[in-house]
Design a protein with these regions (language model features):
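Transmembrane alpha-helical segments of integral membrane proteins
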Residues: 168-179
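Membrane-interfacial helix-loop-helix
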Residues: 2-33, 60-155, 180-194, 202-227
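Residues that scaffold the ATP/ADP-binding catalytic core of kinase and kinase-like folds
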Residues: 57, 92, 169
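Transmembrane alpha-helix interface/packing and boundary motifs in multi-pass membrane proteins
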Residues: 34-56, 199
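A generic structural signal for solvent-exposed, polar alpha-helical segments
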Residues: 36, 97, 162-165, 173
Length: 228
């Protein structure tokens, strides 16, 4: 519970915490953010990391009146690489570990997350890798599911690169350009909440649909295991 409260505080006051990180670590901030984005996209057990709000807030901070010593273009390049590499690692983990890591009683790797991502992947195919970048939870699990489904690596990489570049550019540069507009700057906490709510709505809707139309997810996993 305490960890959840700390995470919520970090998200709601992410601009303050990022400023503290920059003041303390300066250019090491590049590495810190690289590791956060890499972890969120690279490990199926870390879907809770606040990627969207982090990117927007970082862009706004670099554009602010306080000197950070950071370059928006270097940050952009580093985080694009982190996002692409993270998804690639996640894909490889999925191809090796398979669907059996998802359990009904697992608080992080829930069966319903696998089920929702599997449906999303089946519906949109390769585009799911690109579209899921903008959907919390899905962006962490979609490349893992692609690995389980043995999606051709070349096709996966194509959508992975497009999605990674688009996601990082949209939110980081969006924060850089919009973060200093007075109405946004003066209500930054509300903007962060808005970003979090908007990006989580599709995941919440998918969860509701999953409850309204329950399916035997175990059969899906057994089918994946049989094919492997």
């Amino acid at each position: 519970m305490e960890l959840l409260q700390q995470l919520l505080d970090f998200i709601l006051h992410i601009d303050v915490h990022l400023a503290e990180i920059v003041n303390e670590y300066r250019t090491w901030t590049y590495l810190i953010l690289f590791l956060i984005i890499f972890a969120e996209t690279g490990f199926v057990v870390t879907p809770f990391l606040p990627g969207d709000s982090l990117l927007f807030a970082m862009g706004a901070l670099i554009a602010g009146e306080h000197e950070t010593g950071l370059s928006i273009w270097i940050m952009l390049l580093i985080l694009i690489v982190a996002a692409i590499l993270g998804n690639t690692v996640n894909y490889k983990l999925g191809s090796v570990l398979g669907a059996g890591v998802f359990k009904e009683n697992n608080k992080i790797l829930k069966l319903k997350y696998y089920h929702q991502s599997h449906e999303f992947f089946e519906k949109h195919g390769g585009k799911a890798i690109m579209l899921s970048r903008f959907l919390p939870i899905f962006r962490t699990i979609a490349p893992f599911v692609a690995g389980i489904a043995k999606m051709p690596f070349g096709r996966f990489t194509y959508y992975n690169i497009i999605g990674g570049v688009t996601w990082i550019f949209a939110l980081l540069i969006g924060g850089y350009l919009l973060g200093q507009i007075p109405v946004i700057k003066n209500n930054f906490e509300l903007v962060i909440i808005f970003i979090a709510v908007v990006t989580f709505v599709p995941a919440i809707w998918a969860a509701i649909k999953s409850r309204l139309k329950p399916k035997k997810i175990e059969e899906i996993i057994e089918g994946e295991d049989t094919r492997s």
